[in-house]
Amino acid sequence: MTYEFLQSYWWFLVSLLGALLVFLMFVQGANTLIFCLGKTEEERRLIINSTGRKWEFTFTTLVTFGGAFFASFPLFYSTSFGGAYWLWMIILFSFVIQAVSYEFQNKIGNFLGPKTFQICLIINGIVGPLLLGGAVATFFNGSNFLIDKGNITNNLQPVISRWANASHGLDALLDPWNVVLGLAVLMLARILGMLYIKNNIEHQQIQERCTRQLPWNALLFLLFFLPFLIRLLVKDGFSTSTGSITIESMKYLHNLLEMPFLLVILLIGVVLVLFGIFKSSRSVQYRKGIWFTGIGTVLTVLVLLLIAGWNNTAYYPSNIDLQSSLTLANSCSSEFTLHTMAIVSLLIPFVLAYIVFAWRAIDRKRITQEEIEQGEAY
């Protein structure tokens, strides 16, 4: 395995984790619908207990996503997570209050009341997808940072990456296209949440409400996602093919055309997303939409992240100094580290198999009102 192959391999793994994270944010999407789909306290508890079975998957994937970046591309980790820390801290805090809300909303002695923690779940459901989408958009639109590897010999301040302003990541929200992708991810999370609830909860009224609301949320998703995708394909990108970082017209479109297998996967992903939404919005009884739209989401997001870094592309552009932009080559770990981790990564299929087994065991029976009343529940 060459060094270049290892860099591309680990970018694929990080991108796959990011794609899975977007799919698993159906938990956040469903939580934004607690009061829209649940008209009584019993119905709201059904929704919360449905997502409560899966929130650990989302949180663990988020942490693993960050850990994989730290291990394979440490300069990105120190630049983005260390420089844009306000953005990432808000995201992390929203996930922490989610965990607390699940565990404490119906505990004895909860003087704040269940509704307070339900509102916290809604906050996480909005903030998490919105800001994560905005953070991912910076892979294409850039951020405000500087890299000076010469500082490594500075005994007083051996810091090679620094943020160029005091906002430390919040400036990403000043770029309207970052916000557009954030809103697209939020609407996609809501769609996935509805599809998951249709599949997981045995309750006629809730399923009917999901079916009615799906088309409107799908329309809003397309209104945000399609303009972002079209702009992405025609905008300038950041190429490293000449040895230095240069601007290349329609770089991301060129990446798809030069790697046609990614273009095919992208088209399949988009079709699956739309098929799952269409079928689910046409019938209250149809419950398999989560799998079509979920798989389509993973494929689509995977391709978008791959074209951000593969084919001699700077995946984290600097808007302050073009040559400070991060690439797979200038931000990765050593060849020995990547090679060793690649061997360990061969265990990933076994981990995925365990996750599938655990998922099937948890969802062997759909949630019903009787189960909430008789068993242990959130």
Report residues per predicted region.
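Membrane-interface helix-loop-helix junctions at boundaries between adjacent transmembrane segments
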Residues: 80-88, 97-185
